[in-house]
């Protein structure tokens, strides 16, 4: 799918991976890019505008934990440009001692944003179809013992996204739902990580993981932009060590009819 002439909403678009993806996407001649973020970085937004002046860039201060804020922010997009073609859910934190905050941002906020956006994008309702990319993690595919709460939130994203990626929904809505899983990437998520583990005695295994090889956010962001353009409904992609790989999940159970 070409994103030229399309309207993109990027939640968490000023984070490291998100911002790099936005920098790539804006070179594709988008009609508009809506950057939703709790962070306020006017210089970063201005830099995006300068990359491609043909694309209109909007910044919205966004609280993903507020259903009212989600509803109003997406309604503002429709009021400005009529359609949402691409939604990227990229907000995320690592802070296992604060269970509610972690789940509210990483999972519940993502779910609420997706459910609010779908009727606006649905080709049989107010929209013209499109693609939703939910950012999970490799720790949404494999256990993450040092950060069990973070891991649980990302497993939740995985289950939610794969469920919405069922062909039945795509046939009705025209919205592809894709899951993107970054591997270890050099971002501030790792800052002060020793205070963010599940237990005090998680530190030993956590520090081993924290000192393993990472990739640059520029590489991961470029992979994310590529996944958006693929519009591969129901798919799962891993970006790890500079390589983008499509995942074929194991099937452990199927209903008997």
UniProtKB/Swiss-Prot annotation:
Name of the protein: Alcohol dehydrogenase 1
UniProt KW Signal keyword: no
Assembly with partners or alone: Homodimer.
GO cellular component: cytoplasm
Organism: Ceratitis cosyra (Mango fruit fly)
Record-annotated active site: 150
Pfam families the UniProt entry points to: adh_short (PF00106)
UniProt KW keywords: NAD, Oxidoreductase
Catalytic activity: a primary alcohol + NAD(+) = an aldehyde + NADH + H(+); a secondary alcohol + NAD(+) = a ketone + NADH + H(+)
Classification via InterPro entries: ADH_Ceratitis-type, NAD(P)-bd_dom_sf, Sc_DH/Rdtase_CS, SDR_fam
An example molecular function term from Gene Ontology annotations: alcohol dehydrogenase (NAD+) activity
SUPFAM superfamilies reported for this sequence: NAD(P)-binding Rossmann-fold domains (SSF51735)
EC code: 1.1.1.1
Gene3D superfamilies according to UniProt: NAD(P)-binding Rossmann-like Domain
Top-level enzyme category: oxidoreductase
Family: Belongs to the short-chain dehydrogenases/reductases (SDR) family.
């Amino acid at each position: 799918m070409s994103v030229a002439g399309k309207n993109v909403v990027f939640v968490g678009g000023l984070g490291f991976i998100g911002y790099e993806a936005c920098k790539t996407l804006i070179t594709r001649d988008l009609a508009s890019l809506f950057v939703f973020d709790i962070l306020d970085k006017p210089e970063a937004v201005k830099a995006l505008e300068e990359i491609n002046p043909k694309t209109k860039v909007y910044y919205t201060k966004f609280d993903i934990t507020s259903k009212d804020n989600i509803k109003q922010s997406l309604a503002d997009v429709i009021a400005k440009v009529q359609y949402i073609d691409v939604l990227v859910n990229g907000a995320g934190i690592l802070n296992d001692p604060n269970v509610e905050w972690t789940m509210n941002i990483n999972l519940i906020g993502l779910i609420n944003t997706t459910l609010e956006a779908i009727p606006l994008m649905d080709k049989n309702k107010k929209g013209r179809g499109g693609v939703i990319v939910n950012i999970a993690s490799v720790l949404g595919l494999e256990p993450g013992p040092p950060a069990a709460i973070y891991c649980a939130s990302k497993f939740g994203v995985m289950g939610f996204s794969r469920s919405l990626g069922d062909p039945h929904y795509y046939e009705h809505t025209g919205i592809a739902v894709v899951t993107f899983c970054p591997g270890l990437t050099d971002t501030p998520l790792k800052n002060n990580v020793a205070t963010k583990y599940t237990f005090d005695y998680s530190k030993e295994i956590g520090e081993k993981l924290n000192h393993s090889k990472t990739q640059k956010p520029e590489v991961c962001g470029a992979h994310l932009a590529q996944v958006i353009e693929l519009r591969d409904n129901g798919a799962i992609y891993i970006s790890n060590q500079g390589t983008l790989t499509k995942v074929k999940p194991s099937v452990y159970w199927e209903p008997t009819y």
